[in-house]
Design a protein with these regions (language model features):
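Short, polar/acidic, helix-capping and beta-turn segments at strand->helix junctions
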Residues: 1-155
Length: 155
């Protein structure tokens, strides 16, 4: 049975799917003590296709990037569920790190990453407010528009 957080997400139309398997020599998450570190998740949707591909500011809009960041956050939540079995075990979202595939003059990375941050707050309320870093990068795996990683305090 889905926990309270997962039910809240479902009411908002968010359904968690099986998390993606790592594509190289790493694991999807590591738990140490009461912290869960989730590896970077690109913006792959439930159909296995990228939500947005290419560079922000050179063909990908802020709105498309925002939706991609939200997709990354959904993938983070899927990894958390795989790690813990229940999203209700998240005590708080500690930090998100976002990577935005950006044209050299693209300056709106923080607006893009709000897609991920907004979903965390929608899911966890005040426990979803977090520290965050947004970095514009020259490229991401599979030419994904956005990748997001996270650190979570868990019980």
């Amino acid at each position: 049975m889905a926990g309270t957080i997962e039910q809240k997400l479902a009411a908002q139309g968010v359904v968690l799917h099986e998390p993606a398997s790592p594509v190289a020599n790493y694991v999807g998450f590591v738990r140490t003590g009461n912290l869960l570190f989730v590896s970077g998740q690109v913006c792959v949707g439930p159909d296995g296709k990228l939500i947005a591909k290419g560079k922000l500011g050179a063909g990908v809009t802020v709105e498309q990037g925002n939706a991609a960041a939200r997709g990354c956050a959904i993938n983070l939540l899927a990894q958390i569920k795989a790690a813990l079995g229940d999203l209700d075990k998240v005590v708080r979202v500690v930090r998100l790190g976002g990577f935005v595939n950006s044209a050299p003059d693209f300056l709106d990375g923080p607006k893009v990453l709000n897609g991920a941050s907004d979903l965390m707050v929608a899911a966890f309320g005040d426990k979803g407010r977090h520290a965050r870093t947004t970095v514009g990068v020259a490229a991401l795996p599979s030419d994904a528009a956005v990748e997001v990683e996270g650190i979570f305090e868990v019980s």
